[in-house]
Design a protein with these regions (language model features):
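A conserved mid-protein helix/loop that constitutes part of the nucleotide-sugar donor-binding site
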Residues: 1-7, 179-202, 206, 215, ...
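A short, active-site helix/loop in glycosyltransferases that binds the activated sugar's phosphate group
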Residues: 120-147, 153-157
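Short His-centered aromatic/hydrophobic patch
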Residues: 70-76, 98
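Acidic donor-binding loop of glycosyltransferase active sites
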Residues: 238-252, 265
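A short helix/loop element that forms part of the nucleotide-sugar donor recognition site in Leloir-type
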Residues: 159-174, 307, 313-317
Length: 355
């Protein structure tokens, strides 16, 4: 989503600098292809983090960006610390980016606690979901200004593509008549692959394609296939009929569901994060951690006649085009930054971010 946002801002004449805390990271090459300047820090250990903070502070002083936008918990905290070390320049708005709703406190509780204590530092906190706002306020975040900006989906890339559909199905030995459900998610407890696979075992008439890092090691039923990490998700989605999300917690805005809808797939999702808002009454919304309910929703979508399922998929795409385009997301970020006091103009670097 960071890549999409930077692309949308560049299209509006705003040069971008992204600071990556993971070195090359998964997005660095894509950002550089767009023309974004990527600064790689990749801190290791306490000493490395201190050096990275100093480097980031020097970068802020040098670039004097209109906005220093954090991204995820680590990025938010690094942005806050470096902004302070740089003297908290008045002409650089500090903003945070929350990308999740409820989390596993055992894994992320320390980061959440630090964020809670520092949540008054940024001039703006942006969440990609109302569920994320509600969760963080309940956890004690007290930001000065909040904005909910849903993710933007590239509907040119994610679209119905008969040629891509036919090619991938031939590659995987799936007929054009087969009903195919796409699950795009890394292997992580929040994505709840166990519930998905339990539901899949109850629906032998549906073929399941699992795309995401870690999925190749899963024990799968006969009607499921793992594709591992893929950089061509647009092609994977185009080959499907149903976009399915089995997340148990932690989702803010589900890109996988929205991208599948943009590709013309009917959605089946658990009611986690803002999934209900994304679906907008389309497809099926089921409780999390309920394999029977998920299996029944999949049955309902799979037994639709093919023309009815295609029509439902086109309605899903129309919803994403109307409500969740990349251009709309970029405009919402610009409006939120300006409302929080950012002065965006001139010809120099405008924003910086932490990845």
């Amino acid at each position: 989503m960071l890549v999409a946002l930077c692309g949308g801002l560049l299209a509006r004449g705003m040069p971008q600098h992204v600071v990556s805390l993971t070195g090359d990271g998964p997005n660095a090459a894509a950002l550089e292809r767009l023309g974004v300047t990527v600064h790689r820090l990749a801190p290791r250990g306490a000493a490395g983090s201190a050096v990275a903070l100093l480097r980031l502070a020097r970068l802020i002083r040098s670039l004097r960006p209109a906005v220093v936008q954090g991204w995820l918990y680590h990025g938010d905290l690094f942005a806050a610390g470096a902004h302070r070390l740089a003297g908290a320049p008045r002409d650089s708005l500090l903003a945070w980016g929350l990308r999740n709703s409820d989390i596993d406190h055992a894994r992320y509780g320390r980061l959440l606690a630090i964020g809670r204590r520092l949540s008054g530092w940024p001039g703006l906190v942006v969440s990609n979901s109302q569920a994320g706002v509600d969760f963080h306020l309940a956890e004690g975040y007290r930001p000065r200004r909040l904005a909910v900006i849903p993710n933007g989906i590239d509907t040119v890339r994610f679209r119905p593509d008969p040629a891509a559909r036919a090619a991938l199905r031939r590659e995987l030995g799936l007929s054009d008549e087969a009903v195919v459900a796409i699950h795009a998610a890394r292997l992580d407890p929040m994505k709840d692959h166990a519930t998905l696979l339990a539901a899949a075992a109850c629906r032998p008439e549906v073929h399941f394609l699992l795309a995401g890092e870690g999925t190749l090691g899963l024990d799968l039923p006969a009607n499921a296939r793992a594709l591992g990490r893929r950089d061509d998700l647009w092609r994977i989605q185009a080959a499907g009929d149903i976009a399915v999300s089995s997340s148990a917690f932690g989702e803010g805005f589900s890109n996988a569901v929205a991208e599948g809808m943009a590709a013309g797939l009917v959605p089946v999702a658990t009611s986690v994060g803002d999934a209900g808002a994304i679906l907008g009454g389309l497809g099926c919304l089921v409780p999390p951690r309920d394999p029977a309910a998920l299996a029944e929703a999949l049955r309902a979508m799979a037994t639709l006649l093919a023309p009815a399922r295609r029509a439902a998929g086109l309605a899903a795409r129309a919803r994403i085009e109307t409500a969740y385009g990349v251009g709309a997301m970029a405009e919402r970020f610009l409006a939120a930054w300006i409302a929080a006091g950012a002065v965006i103009g001139g010809g120099g670097p405008r924003t910086g971010g932490g990845e």
